[in-house]
């Protein structure tokens, strides 16, 4: 039974290996030879008193039948919940990220012109115990981790790539309206009105707001992966800014 923090570390290396080689190859295909691509195994500190630990809500792993879920719960003391009518999955805590442990190294690499893959899977969740970092049984939300990373690197824009070109209010209804350019205040209003689904667009919009309001001039962009270029050019996507 591998600890969840170790599973995150393994997935960072596994996925990072493929991603960095794909990026390296694409750079070379474009005759760009002076940029190094590197994956940083990234630990992210969480608060052991975060309320999320008392209310696990993040589904992980494969879908199971009720009988399989009961067996896993008894065998490993997992918390299992029904998910979207497709079966049962394990749920774990999803605490807010507080500190990126390797931020100094990441910043040095970025400042030197390297292309850095960091905070994979939201980061390896750890709790500080004196000088020791203890792995936590949790999964950190990737959008919040990205917002924290962007703030720490003093980025101008946070780009959140997802499965749709723009965020929308009244999604999936006849009143559906795509959002192009909105202020932080408008985004907070839409969040309060419940327009964004938990576990889907809601954390993306919350992370976008968190970054956009963190300093003057910062903006967040939510768009489709295939439309990233057009989004950066201001031609599509949902852009969130302070005023």
How does the language model describe each region?
Residues 1-243:
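C-terminal catalytic "cap/lid" subdomain
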